[in-house]
Amino acid sequence: LVSGRLTNVAGSSDVLRGSIVSYSSEVKFDVLGVSPGPVVNEQVAVEMAVGARRVLGADVGLALTGVAGPADQDGVKPGTLCVGLALPDGSTTSRTFHLPGVRDQMRQLSVISALDYLRRAIAEK
């Protein structure tokens, strides 16, 4: 969803190297190098962002992991979104959001929340 939103803009190939949809836990572990365990927390979001940056050879890694419902996942409530960033200077940052709404609303709010978080982090650097 995030890369889809970014590629709606002409010229996006100048700034977007690619994206990885790690919907399954196995892809998080095997492709992105996430430590085994529950996958919806800020540490996992950071590990995903670092892994995406490494795999794609990108300056910045942005990662989202969360629960859109309808049921809890490993005790994490629907609407929970963890965003991780891996920045060019090697620093990382993360944040947890609690999003309202039903599944489709949460998915769209996830994109908005993650891109705004990225924008703010880059502006602060």
Residue ranges and their predicted role:
Residues 1-125:
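Short alpha-helical segments enriched in small residues
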